[in-house]
A protein has these predicted regions:
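Ribonuclease/tRNase effector modules and their secretory precursors
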Residues: 1-124
């Protein structure tokens, strides 16, 4: 039973995520956020290993909050920049807000001069 509900959640969330494609974000000067395969894969995999089913389930359930976080006022923004030999500058932006009595945070990533793309989501 749990396996079937996980499979349905995975399929439904994948369809929802693919429909997001690109969204302008007022918290990063109206730049586009790209919703590509790497971001969705990161919901399921970390450090080249599958996340636990519980962690995947939790992250998949949070995907519905992405548009609200990107477009709402009252969102907290944190930025971190690191240097990489492979990509040059990597910028991570965390946007978080309170939804349904929990803090939901999305991570955006920008490699070098590329576009921002969705990287992860979590709750506290």
């Amino acid at each position: 039973m749990l396996r079937n509900s996980y499979k349905k959640l995975l399929e439904d969330t994948r369809k929802y995520y693919k429909n997001l494609k690109k969204i302008r974000c007022k918290h990063i000067e109206n730049d586009l956020i790209i919703f590509g395969d790497s971001g969705f894969s990161h919901l399921l995999i970390k450090d080249r290993k599958l996340r636990s089913i519980d962690e995947q389930f939790r992250k998949l359930c949070l995907v519905q909050y992405i548009p609200q976080i990107i477009n709402n006022d009252g969102i907290k923004k944190e930025t971190r920049i690191i240097q990489s030999k492979e990509y040059g500058q990597i910028e991570y932006i965390a946007l978080s807000g309170n939804f349904d009595n929990k803090i939901v945070k999305i991570i955006l990533r920008k490699l070098g001069n590329g576009n921002y793309h969705f990287w992860s989501i979590m709750d506290k």
